[in-house]
Every structure is written in C-alpha cells, then in structure tokens.
Amino acid sequence: MIQRFQKRDLILYTFMLAILVSIWLAMFQIDRQWHFIAQTQDKIDEQTRDIADLRRQIQRGAVLSGPVSEADSQTLPADWQAFARADDASRAADYARGDWLISSFPSQVPTLTPFLSGDTYSSNVQRWVIDTLITRDPATLEWLPLVAEKWSISDDGLSITFTVREGLVFSDGQPLTAQDVAFSWHFMMDEKIAAPRDRSYYSRITSVESNGRDVTFQFAEPYFESFQIAGLMAILPEHFYGKYLESVATAEEFNRSTGLLLGSGPYRMVSPTDWKPGDLIELVRNERYWGWVSAPFERRIWKSIQVDAAQLTEFKNGGIDVYTARPLEYRDLVQDEAVTSGAQPFEYYDPRGGYIYIAWNQLRSGSATPFADRRVREAMTYLTDRQRIVDEILMGYALVANGPFNPLGKQANPNLVTRQFDVAKAKSLLAEAGYIDRDRDGVVESEQGVPLSFKITYPSGSDNYKRVVLLLKDLYVKAGVLMEPNPVDWPVLITALNNKDFDAISLGWTGDFEIDVYQNMHSSQTEPGGDNFINYKNPELDGLIENARREMNEDLRMPLWHQVHALLWREQPYTYLFRSKSLVFSDRRIQNVKVERAGLNTGGLWSMPMEWYVPSGQQKYSR
C-alpha cells in the first residue's frame, strides 16, 4: 500500500535539514577557526624567527638599520668560525631556506632520551637537537668554538675552562648558561640515572663547576681526549631535566622514558616529551636558534625502514633524500641513468665509519664459553674468509680489518699481518684447544663430547649481514664447527647486549682518526650496561690502554697504541671483519653536498652546522 506524504513528515524532514545545516555551519566555523589558528601560529613563528635573527645581529655587533638579512656583508669574527662554511653557503645566489630533508634508519630506534640511548641512530638525531661547547671543521679538523666563545687549558692539562656565549637560549626560550653545562655532567654522573656507558666515558672528569659565564672541567690525570670529551659533552637544560634527580622515583621515570629530548640546537622535537618507538622521527626548525646562520631545512625527518629492499624502493620513489646503498646496489645504481639523473652518487672512506666485527662472548649465564679459549677465537678468525666477503659480497667497496684502529691514521700498527683464510690452521688450533671429531660425524667435539656449536646474533632486515653470516656458516662447517644464524630486531639485539645473552654477535663500531678502546675492551667495562659485553678481561691490555690514554704527547702515545693493537691481534676477542666504503646518494635538488676529510658534509657530526640547502624553485615540501 502506498503511503501518503503527511504533515508530520514535512516537519521531520525540515528538522533533519536544520540539523544538517547546523552541522555544516559548525564545520565551516571550525574550519575558519583552524585557519585562524594556523595563521596565528605562522605569525608567531615568523615573529620568533625575526627575534632570533635580531638576536643573531646583536651578537654580531651589527647596526640594526634596515631589514635583517640571513647573510649580510659582515666578516665572521674568530669566535664564530664554526659557522663559516654554513655562512658561505647562505651567500650563494640560489640559497633558500625551506623544504624537508628526509633520511632513513635500517632499524627502529628504541629511545631518543639522552644518555639512555647507546646506538648510532639515536645519536644522529640528538646531535641536531642538543648543542655542544665546540665543533670541528670537516675539512681541516680544527676545533672551533660553538656554544663556548673561547677556552683555556692549564699547563698540566688537568683543567679546561670554557666561556659560554651570552644571550643563548634553549628551544623553549629559556636561557642557556654555564650552569646548564655543569648540570649536564652532574646529571649524567648521578647513579640514579641509567647511564653507565656515559659515566664510563666521562670517568676521568672529577668535577665540573660553573662561575658566571665560565665552566671548568677538572680531570684526575692527563688524558689525550680531555678537550674533546669536555667540549663535545651534550648540554642539557637544567629546568627541563633537573626534576628527574629529585628522587629515585623521578629518576626511574627518566630511565623508562623514550622521548625526553630538549636542547638548544638548530632543530627541535615537535613535542620534547611524547615520542615513542615506532613513531616517525620528525624534527622542526628551531626558530629560537642562536647560531650565526639558522637551519636551512624546515624539517629533518628519519623513517624507520627495516628491510633493505624497501629502503631502495622508497629512495627510487623519492620518499627519502639520502640513501646509503649496499655495494651490489651501488654498482648497478651508478649505471642507471634514471637514478643518476635525479641523485648524485658519493663514494668515500669515512674516517668515522668504523668497522664491522664478530664479538665472541666468553662468559654466558655464569659459565665460560668455548670462546674463553684464545685458540678457539683465533681459529674462528682463520675460518672467516674476510677477503672473500669483501670481494663477493661487498664488491670490493671495503678493506679487510685486522683491528679497531683506522689504517689510514697513525694509530694502527703497520707491522701486523692480516690473517688469511686457512682451514688447516684453524683445525690445528681447535685440536690444541681439545676440539676434534671424536665420533667421525664431521663435527668437532670437546673432551666431554659437546659439539662446537653456537649462534651468531645480528640485526635482522639487512641483506648484507644475512649474506655474510650464511657464507660464514658454510665456511665454518669445513672445520667441523656448527653455526646457526640468529637475526633479531634492533630492540631485542640491544637487550641481548645489555644482558650479555648471546654466543657471538656481529655489529659495528663507529671510528675516528684516533679512538679509545677503553670503553669496549677494558676489564672494568664488563659491569652491567658496560660496552665490554663479551666479558673479556686482560690485565696486560688494561695497563697498555691506561698508559696510552694518559700520554698527552702524540709521538709517545702512538707506540703505546701499537702495542694495544698487537695484543688485540694476538688475542682476537673480536674477529675484525671489514671497513666499508660509504656509498651514498643524495637528491640532486640538494645543493652544496661535498666530501671532506671528515666524510660527507652532512652537518650534525660534532654538532657542525648544516651546509646543504635546496633552491626555492626546486623545493618539493612545504609546511
């Protein structure tokens, strides 16, 4: 039966129409409000930027007549030379601020909170947010003042005083003072804070005291890296982090945190408290930045892409601007015109690139492992065909390593011969250690009949690691040694390191022109949280490291490091695998990308100001 349209239906439809109109008007009003808020925020940001520019002009001693410009005609004073290269870039005819710089990490970052993070990835982010007293010229390697405007060193080398610049502020607008520098050391050294690695690194400092604009670092004894240690210490704001020292409970709150990150650097977190593992790592330009030149990019972003193939796809699709290629990829990509037309390749040995290694754990769950025997460790090195890894997996873009020291510098012992692949020698050493094939099943066993079998733990998602470990599995079995690959996600791997819960592990250490191996080889660093996670203890090595560390004269120090190198070469606590070339592509819209003595001039390293930029006509991202 057909229903007639009645009066009450008209009333109902009219009521519904009124509701819809009200909703539409409300949405329109909300949209206008959001637009107003966005405009207001833009004005606030612009005013904050102008104030920061005015502050920079005042610091330069400029006469404030006429409009403020990023690059004026002033000559940089000596105490602002850290910004000389960035200042030169800002004077280029096509220079412009804006756009985003997007990179990627091959693993998920577990925490961005200072002192709690022990991985390279979190450090890369922190360097853009947290300032240091000094920085370094990437071409000359000369130390330059940054937050400090000058320094003085006592004749005995035990006291270093830095004078902090006037008028500096953190990204929340609060002033940065010498007291914040002193607080940063006291915060880190407080036993309530879970920072054993950093406490070990800064253990030579006996006190840090502020007096006006001066802050003085006092050392217990001479140490060759004293100036670098003091000058590169992260400067934390006391007003933000100080509350976490109030009690054990507040310290535990800090220790459990993942995203407490606030500083005075050229970039800042959108929120300095809310970041969690799995979130996009996104920094925005610090509009209150005090430096001579402000940050060129509007945003600095890192994506977590844990599969190599996915990283390459993201790079080819333009989703990331800087891509570190695997050797096989690089060989093919540099011949791909579609890639090179949009991205510029760079190939170089980064002095800070460090080395890849296999570390042999000597004590697990309170019991000695087979790797507690030096002969077993040496046998494993003979079974590791490192030249084949370099040739077949790394396509020749690497050097075989025979120790922790940079072979391009003075610290490496030039008289040490790199062990070559030798199955017969490995079998002989294993037999000396009591491992022979007792039941003729092709596997060597101990005197108790226990097969020599273990797992190698390594980061999952990396094809290079996977290929290396699978090759080693085939090589080791030639001597009757059974190895099982154990790929794990980065947070799981960090937990295994902290708990010393692994048989063997393959990772990398960053390097430098001269490094200190106290952190990962001294017996004292086997404590929980220390970086001697393989439980290797050698009093002879401890003494050599200590002697080298306290020798201030480089000509006398290098022979001591050569002795350290010789002992590590003999003991083989690690099997040092290789030092890779950096094989990097950067989007061609990014200008002023160069290879310097310190590597690619990406900025951030040693808190160096960013020198890259994108001309306005080539920018692809906006706010």
Regions found by a protein language model. Give the residues of each.
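Aromatic- and charge-enriched surface segment that lines or borders ligand/interaction sites
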Residues: 43-50, 149-194, 213-218, 311-314, ...
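Ligand-site clamp/hinge motif
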Residues: 255-256, 287-334, 474, 482-484, ...
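Gly/Pro-rich hinge or "lid" segments in bacterial periplasmic/extracellular proteins
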Residues: 124, 131-142, 234-294, 299, ...
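Extracellular/periplasmic solute-recognition and catalytic clefts
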Residues: 188, 207, 270-282, 303-367, ...
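N-terminal lobe/hinge region of extracytoplasmic solute-binding protein
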Residues: 85-87, 99-155, 186, 262-266
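Surface-exposed binding/hinge segments that line
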Residues: 94, 163, 198-247
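A structural "hinge/loop" feature
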Residues: 107-123, 147, 174, 226-236, ...
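Detector for C-terminal structural segments
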Residues: 15-24, 60-72, 77, 81-85, ...
